C-alpha cells in the first residue's frame, strides 16, 4: 500500500521552491494516455515542462521523473536529465525521445530503470501511482558524471548542489491509458 504522504524529497532538506508548469500535465491530476508507457497503451511521450523563478545563482538544471510507489522498495526512475544550461526554462512535449533532438545543447540523459536514455511513460502494475516531475536548480554549470550512472547517483550529486526545486506530481492508474 502506498503512503501518499511520502515525499521522496522531504528528507533532503528544505530549499526554495520555484514555479513549474506544463501544457500537458497538472499537479494532482491524472496523466494523459500519451504519457503512459507503450506497453500500457501509451506512447512514452514526455510532457511539456516550463519553469520560472529559479533562485539567483542558478548555473544549470537537472530534471527527473520518479515513481515512489513502484513495487520495488526503491521506486522507479522514468527520466533523468542534467547539465541543462541556466538559460533553459522549458522542455517541449516529446523532449524525452531517444534522439535528443529537442533537448538543449549540452544536456545529458542518463539511462532510466529500463536502461534506456529517454523518457519512459507511466506503467503502474497494481494501483494508482504518483509521478514526481522535478526541476532542480543547481549552483554548478555542470555535473561530471559517468554516462552510465544511475538516476540515484544523479540524485546524490544533485543533493549537494541544489539551490531550489520545482515539482508537479501527477497520478496514473493501471487502466488510465485505456481511457
Identify the meaning behind each predicted range.
Residues 1-179:
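N-terminus-centered regions that define maturation/targeting leaders and the start
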Amino acid at each position: 500500500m502506498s503512503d501518499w504522504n511520502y515525499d521522496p524529497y522531504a528528507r533532503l532538506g528544505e530549499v526554495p521552491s520555484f514555479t513549474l508548469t506544463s501544457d500537458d500535465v497538472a499537479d494532482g491530476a491524472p496523466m494523459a494516455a500519451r504519457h503512459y508507457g507503450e506497453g500500457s497503451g501509451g506512447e512514452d511521450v514526455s510532457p511539456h515542462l516550463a519553469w520560472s523563478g529559479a533562485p539567483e545563482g542558478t548555473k544549470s538544471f537537472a530534471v527527473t521523473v520518479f515513481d515512489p510507489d513502484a513495487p520495488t522498495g526503491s521506486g522507479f526512475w522514468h527520466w533523468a536529465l542534467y547539465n541543462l544550461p541556466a538559460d533553459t526554462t522549458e522542455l517541449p512535449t516529446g523532449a524525452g525521445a531517444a534522439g535528443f533532438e529537442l533537448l538543449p545543447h549540452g544536456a545529458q540523459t542518463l539511462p532510466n530503470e529500463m536502461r534506456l536514455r529517454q523518457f519512459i511513460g507511466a506503467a503502474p502494475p497494481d494501483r494508482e501511482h504518483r509521478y514526481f516531475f522535478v526541476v532542480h536548480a543547481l549552483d554548478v554549470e555542470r555535473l561530471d558524471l559517468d554516462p552510465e550512472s544511475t538516476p540515484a547517483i544523479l540524485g546524490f550529486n544533485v543533493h549537494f548542489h541544489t539551490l531550489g526545486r520545482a515539482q508537479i506530481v501527477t497520478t496514473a492508474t493501471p487502466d488510465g491509458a485505456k481511457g
